[in-house]
């Protein structure tokens, strides 16, 4: 794919005038003789990159003509003969995140030669790591006298987690700047970029860097001892912090709808279980189908933020098993299904159902008006819609309505409560789907934030088996915390490396890998897990696998080593794949006592391949030819090459044929 000057400037960190001076060229098929042989082959560029130019560092500098990084050997006031398009953007992406360490290895070059086409690509493996402190779990929930308060501890954890999942979020706003100590000095001290940072930060304390609020928040959330129960909901808070004004309205509305639905089904469940204990005042009962635009009244009645104290107080009214089903049903919207109900009596419910309205059943009336009502609701939001509203289909003829009413009567009388609750959820789900379609591309990333459903379903299964204990709760909390961090980081990498169209158009994601190492208080590795995925959707596929894997492993907590007959079933539960690391490490993870784990190290590795562009500027080609000839002669005489930036006069071009190829280089192709 052709590379424009603007694309090259964006992905190399250089200015547009610099790239216009450089004159980038991707396909050198009919231009090979304009360059020295070492500059056109993969082996030759590898030699130049490693021993002459040091491309792995040089690409991070300001390489404008006459810039400080270009003054002496080997550039002589000109840009280099090549640019690795996307490499500087990759390094900048990793530096802009809260990783503790970053490494870039295996910088290699490959060439593709065929009639009419000769190009060179670069590839690199990035490895970015940070550690989260999980050893402070005992401070998260009071574990004193745990066995006698098991139910209270479980309900406290659930309440805090549900409040985080359904809280009505607003982004943090403030004035001035946020500063983070000990960050931001990832560039070489003498580089032009570092000099610019130092000039900007004059008067600022040593080692501090001005950072966005969301980056400061995430650095804070890395330590469970420090953030305590604020860790719950970290991923969603960071997501809405980065959203634009339109996305903020849509995401907040989606969260309100989930909250309202959760409060609705909890109220209905509690009322069914205790019809005389929770009478509802008449003013709060909605009359259907007269309230045909019932969504606004529904939100007004039920979208109050979920309160942890009120959830804990539900212990007598709503069994934990039913509470978990309600949580899963609400959090999984717009997917999933309504919670199963065993009582079809709607007495004490939150809606006043009128069996017939003009000869038609309530649920059927709601279903027929659903699309038009949803469109009106979205149109009333203070956002500009991305899609033109399709007008609703005309109502069916009256003859059909009369005939259908007779057929519906018996079914509706039999299934009214169940069908009605299903219709409420279907309406909310369809509205959420429509709102998600209105999100901008950068905010439409729910595939990274659905992990909560896996963990709630795991606790639901444990509750059904009567297997809730300290070990399962400890692992549930710890892995939920790990999943929050994993989701946030993978979403960040997805947004910067796959969802940024300019980068994704030219740079290919070959492999993505997440390595999770649990360490004890002395730093020893307790177990290590590896997940690999390839292809364009590698980041989202990794999140789905990790979420399912960690949630399934929660159910094995406290059971010790797996028996032979259990291993195959466990591997099926975590959807084991051959590229998921050593099986013994997986079994060790399932059997370990989580009290031994003090911290979890998360490593995110990904391999990228991008294009190399060549210069068409004769002056740069000439300097490169003279530099390569001089370096080749020094190497032939077994002498050391000058250090980059050394004050070496530009050598003259020797007379005669070109110097011999460096080791490993191949002769020029002729077709």
From Swiss-Prot:
Site for Priming of strand displacement replication by covalently linking the first nucleotide of the new DNA chain, residues: 580
Positions of region (Disordered): 386-409, 645-671
GO function terms (MF aspect): double-stranded DNA binding; single-stranded DNA binding
Keyword Acetylation annotated: no
UniProt xrefs under InterPro entries: Adeno_preterminal
Keywords: Covalent protein-DNA linkage, DNA replication, DNA-binding, Host nucleus, Phosphoprotein, Viral DNA replication
Residues modified as O-(5'-phospho-DNA)-serine: 580
Motif (Nuclear localization signal): 380-389
HAMAP family assigned to the protein according to its UniProt record, in alphabetical order: ADV_TERM
Homology family: Belongs to the adenoviridae terminal protein family.
Protein name according to UniProt: Preterminal protein
Gene: PTP
